[in-house]
């Protein structure tokens, strides 16, 4: 098998991620949300009291990306940040009522992206399962930093 780009899993995952993110970005525009803002609201809905560090780990985002994002979401009154009462070094993040309201309007966005992908629901479930296995794999090659 030649070493063409279209035969490289890394390239196909990269290109797919870029296109799906682009589709989400277009569909989220009416809500004044970016893709990372969207997944942040999803993560906060799953975890009602989460620290900034935990949120960054959950979303695979570093603090340099996460902090400005949280400031934007806070300015829109979608989230609030508070110091933990147990440990003041920790900052906890919560969805506000407005954040919950906008989040409840968004399931249709995911359905539209899936529909536009031209894959069946069964293929979607299979792909999601394969990708979860890859993402949550205990990788043998570790970053030494």
Regions found by a protein language model. Name each.
Residues 71-129:
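Charged, amphipathic alpha-helical coiled-coil/dimerization segments
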Residues 14, 42-46, 107:
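Short, locally clustered residues in the helix-turn-helix/winged-helix DNA-binding domain
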Residues 6, 10, 34, 63, ...:
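Short, structured helix-loop boundary elements
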Residues 1-6, 122, 126-129, 135-145:
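Short, Lys/Arg-enriched, disordered terminal segments
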Residues 1-31:
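N-terminal leader segment of winged-helix/HTH proteins
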Residues 16, 20-23, 59, 102, ...:
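Alpha-helical linker/hinge and terminal dimerization helices associated
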Residues 22-65:
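N-terminal helix-turn-helix DNA-binding core of bacterial DNA-binding proteins
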């Amino acid at each position: 098998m030649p070493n063409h780009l279209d035969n490289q899993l890394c390239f196909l995952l990269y290109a797919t991620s870029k296109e799906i993110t682009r589709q989400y970005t277009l569909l989220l525009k009416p809500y004044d949300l970016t893709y990372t803002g969207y997944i942040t609201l999803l993560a906060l809905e799953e975890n009602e009291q989460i620290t900034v560090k935990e949120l960054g780990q959950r979303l695979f985002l570093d603090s340099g990306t996460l902090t400005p994002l949280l400031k934007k979401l806070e300015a829109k009154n979608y989230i609030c940040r508070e110091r933990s009462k147990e440990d003041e070094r920790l900052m906890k993040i919560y969805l506000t009522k407005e954040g919950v309201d906008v989040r409840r309007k968004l399931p249709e966005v995911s359905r539209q992206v899936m529909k536009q992908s031209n894959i069946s629901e069964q293929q979607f479930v299979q792909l999601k399962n394969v990708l979860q296995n890859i993402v949550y794999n205990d990788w043998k090659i570790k970053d030494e930093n």
